[in-house]
Amino acid sequence: MTMSVETQKETLGFQTEVKQLLHLMIHSLYSNKEIFLRELISNASDAVDKLRFEALSKPELLEGGAELKIRVSFDKDAKTVTLEDNGIGMSREDAITHLGTIAKSGTADFMKNLSGDQKKDSHLIGQFGVGFYSAFIVADKVEVFSRRAGLDASEGVHWSSKGEGEFEIATVDKADRGTRIVLHLKDGEDEFADGWRLRNIVKKYSDHIALPIELPKEQAAAEGEETPAQEWEVVNRASALWTRPRTEIKDEEYQEFYKHIGHDYENPLSWSHNKVEGKLEYSSLLYVPARAPFDLYQREAPKGLKLYVQRVFVMDQAESFLPLYLRFIKGVVDSNDLSLNVSREILQKDPIIDSMKSALTKRVLDMLEKLAKNEPEQYKGFWKNFGQVMKEGPAEDFANKEKIAGLLRFASTQGDDGEQVVSLAEYLARAKEGQDKIYYLTGETYAQVKNSPHLEVFRKKGIEVLLLTDRIDEWLMSYLNEFDGKSFVDVARGDLDLGNLDSEEEKKEAEEVAKSKEGLVERIKASLGDAVSEVRVSHRLTDSPAILAIGEQDLGMQMRQILEASGQKVPDSKPIFEFNPAHPLIEKLDGEQSEERFGDLSHILFDQAALAAGDSLKDPAAYVRRLNKLLVELSV
């Protein structure tokens, strides 16, 4: 190819993050060098997809060359590998933007997440989508010649860098649209300037690319004859994976396709491939990743499926096909019913999309149910990564609330390590005879809820309680009313009624005790005044003297903290003070003649109950003063 003289040549510096990334990548990914070709082919495939899409409305972009392909060649003597595509190409500005910076939100977070552990870092880097920069794993100099479709031949661009902090860029003539990347191999990397080696890498990683990938045909001249003209041959299958029958596709092919679309180095946990025919016609291939992306909780992070219409790529990150709580799902949806000029705005309003969304959501939930049932250990890993996001489900997806609830996992009083492994179905299978409720307790930490006085009566009766300590849990439970016909009960809320789990004698005895302590209830109420909404005898306690319960309609502590943190006004609410009439401290309080001392003891018990509930004291100094006064009296 003849190139004209370079003009407007300048040397620019890489964005800081690129420098760091290059350094890390060259070291972290070195053990799996051959992936550079997969990454570059993946980029070339995206460039061709973009051209196909833009050419629908501007056919002149094809410039008379509608046969789209990728070519990989090599030169043993020059020690180069060249990859060429006739896709959309780049302008000078594109080259500076795409090859000099990482145009992706969350870059700083990504850098913070790098640990120095090679295995973990290579996963993170892969997940971040190193793409083009992987060329520097095997090359000490990379040159890019490109021209964006639709620009003049004189507006080509030549970019080159040694990957050490800066790059050169110049304007050149380039007759053909698209991009050519020339890798000047490092010493010791000559193995890649070889037809068979390159063929094997293409077969291994890029067989699923729905675009012909050509390599020079291996041909030798017969003795005494000239070397024949260069011929090319297609070395990949070049058909869209999701359009092929499932029976013909190997697991390895599904896994490689996932790595291509998910920019991931790990195999997915699970996948679901379906073709729907009838009123709506579409194919879908959905994947559950093995690990959460670092930007899972950033609202602006990229999410959504790749959308194709009749096998023509239309857009990345089409968000309208799955609800937000399934934003970690990767995959492809290919519809026959949408028009090719579909936009994101249209997707949000199209009734066809609503039908597809509900079917795809059900498909994902079925896939997760299957994973939980058949691969409980794998599901445990899934839950660690994505459990908090799944907990957003019941609020967002009313139609599938019961299905999502079945996929949730909790810690409970059955275990002693706080691991969230108990499903609601398991909980009910272990429930006591006559138990028609699912009991739970929310709190800040596992240690706090595990040792909460609210659990005393449940321990005594051997009733399992779910322990919820994620920040989202109280909010989740405001949307989960029941599961399998059994309602949820917060053991710290309202007046605890164990229903059939208390015998008639126990109920009668509790009523009599409450009646006999009416005088004490009034005295404590007068002493605590506005600090409480109510004082009553407790049915929950066996060992502790007192606890604070939450009113039936009041906000719990977790919810109050979330609202306060987001700057919202939180309504005032006062706790209910419950005491254990059989506790020696309460008996002593009941017999106390001095009103001043009675007041001090009541306040100390109230403050201790607040601390046990994980709350902070409104007046810690007053608590310390009362406690010290009591200690002095006891020591006299």
Curated annotation (Swiss-Prot):
Designated gene of the protein: htpG
GO molecular function: ATP binding; ATP hydrolysis activity; ATP-dependent protein folding chaperone; unfolded protein binding
Record-linked PROSITE patterns: HSP90
SMART domains found in the cross-reference section: HATPase_c (SM00387)
Pfam family, one: HATPase_c_3
InterPro entries in UniProt: HATPase_C_sf, Heat_shock_protein_90_CS, HSP90_C, Hsp90_fam, Hsp90_N, Ribosomal_Su5_D2-typ_SF
Subunit: Homodimer.
Keywords in alphabetical order: ATP-binding, Chaperone, Cytoplasm, Nucleotide-binding, Stress response
Record's keyword annotation contains Phosphoprotein: no
A cellular component annotation (GO) from this entry: cytoplasm
Family assignment from sequence similarity: Belongs to the heat shock protein 90 family.
Function description: Molecular chaperone. Has ATPase activity.
Subcellular location: Cytoplasm
Residue span of region A: 1-344
Name under which the protein is recorded: Chaperone protein HtpG
Gene3D superfamilies: 3.30.230.80, 3.40.50.11260, Heat shock protein 90, C-terminal domain, Histidine kinase-like ATPase, C-terminal domain
Naturally occurring in which organism (per UniProt): Pseudomonas fluorescens (strain SBW25)
Region called B, residue ranges: 345-561
HAMAP family in UniProt: HSP90
Region of interest: C: 562-636
